């Protein structure tokens, strides 16, 4: 007997503010929680204006440090995702899966591992050998290429992953990314020694997601 695959819809939001993306996520989450709604599982794809965000594990961030980061021209936002401080900005492909894990597997640990495997598989499609480490995320050697921080309530996921494509990496010089001392950051462009914009990464990411999560996927943009 064949098993029906979960259906996922990918939506490209373009470049939007972090706060706008949070509102869109909350709308999708609420629709999932509304028993009368039949909203599909969704991947929200976007880039952000420069913003530093901190997660639930972050100790109270010193006001002086917050002001220092804002003075650089970035926004600053506290979130309910897992993890510590990171940066989002132009040239970084951000993917927010709003999924009902009941359609997949009701395990947050499984879900995070599948996100990591998705990005590793996507990197492989570019010819980049990536891996996991004891620290959440995806790495190329000792350099993080993709940060992962999620939230899950009543098995509905939000937040997600941030893949460095052709990001201005100097933004990371102002923080200790994800609170991990002694490690660096990298991007698809750095690893391939050519410009790789987010739009080039989207088809490979969606292909890898479809394979890893064993789902059907529709996309409102061109995959060519």
Swiss-Prot record:
Q: What is its main location?
A: mitochondrion
Its job: Catalyzes the transfer of endogenously produced octanoic acid from octanoyl-acyl-carrier-protein (octanoyl-ACP) onto the lipoyl domains of lipoate-dependent enzymes such as the protein H of the glycine cleavage system (GCSH). Lipoyl-ACP can also act as a substrate although octanoyl-ACP is likely to be the physiological substrate.
Catalytic activity annotation? octanoyl-[ACP] + L-lysyl-[protein] = N(6)-octanoyl-L-lysyl-[protein] + holo-[ACP] + H(+)
Q: Name one Pfam family in it.
A: LplA-B_cat
What is one GO cellular-component annotation here?
mitochondrion
Similarity remark: Belongs to the LipB family.
Signal sequence extent: none
Q: Where is the active site?
A: 178
In this chain, substrate is annotated as bound at 81-88, 147-149, 160-162
Q: What is this protein called?
A: Octanoyl-[acyl-carrier-protein]:protein N-octanoyltransferase LIPT2, mitochondrial
Pathway listed for it? Protein modification; protein lipoylation via endogenous pathway; protein N(6)-(lipoyl)lysine from octanoyl-[acyl-carrier-protein]: step 1/2
Q: What else is known?
A: In the reaction, the free carboxyl group of octanoic acid is attached via an amide linkage to the epsilon-amino group of a specific lysine residue of lipoyl domains of lipoate-dependent enzymes.
HAMAP family per the UniProt record, alphabetical: LipB (MF_00013)
Domain (BPL/LPL catalytic): give its ranges.
37-217
* Annotated localization: Mitochondrion
The record, for PANTHER family, names: LIPOYLTRANSFERASE 2, MITOCHONDRIAL-RELATED (PTHR10993:SF7), OCTANOYLTRANSFERASE (PTHR10993)
Its domain of life reads Eukaryota
Q: Which UniProt keywords apply?
A: Acyltransferase, Ligase, Mitochondrion, Transferase, Transit peptide
């Amino acid at each position: 007997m064949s098993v029906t695959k979960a259906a996922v819809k990918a939506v490209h939001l373009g470049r939007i503010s972090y706060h706008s993306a949070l509102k869109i996520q909350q709308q999708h989450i609420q629709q999932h929680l509304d028993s009368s709604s039949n909203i599909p599982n969704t991947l929200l794809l976007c880039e952000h204006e420069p913003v530093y965000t901190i997660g639930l594990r972050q100790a109270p961030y010193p006001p002086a440090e917050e002001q220092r980061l804002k003075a650089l021209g970035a926004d600053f936002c506290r979130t309910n995702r897992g993890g510590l401080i990171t940066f989002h900005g132009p040239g970084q492909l951000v993917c927010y899966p709003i999924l009902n894990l009941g359609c997949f597997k009701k395990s947050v640990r499984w879900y995070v591992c599948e996100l990591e495997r998705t990005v590793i598989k996507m990197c492989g499609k570019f010819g980049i050998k990536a891996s996991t480490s004891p620290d959440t995320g995806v790495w190329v050697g000792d350099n993080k290429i993709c940060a992962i921080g999620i939230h899950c309530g009543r098995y509905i996921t939000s937040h997600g992953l941030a893949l460095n494509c052709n990001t201005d990496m100097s933004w990371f010089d102002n923080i200790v990314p994800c609170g991990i001392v002694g490690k660096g950051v990298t991007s698809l462009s750095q690893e391939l020694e050519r410009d790789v914009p987010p739009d080039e990464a989207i088809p490979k990411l969606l292909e890898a997601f479809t394979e890893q999560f064993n789902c059907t996927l529709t996309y409102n943009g061109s995959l060519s």
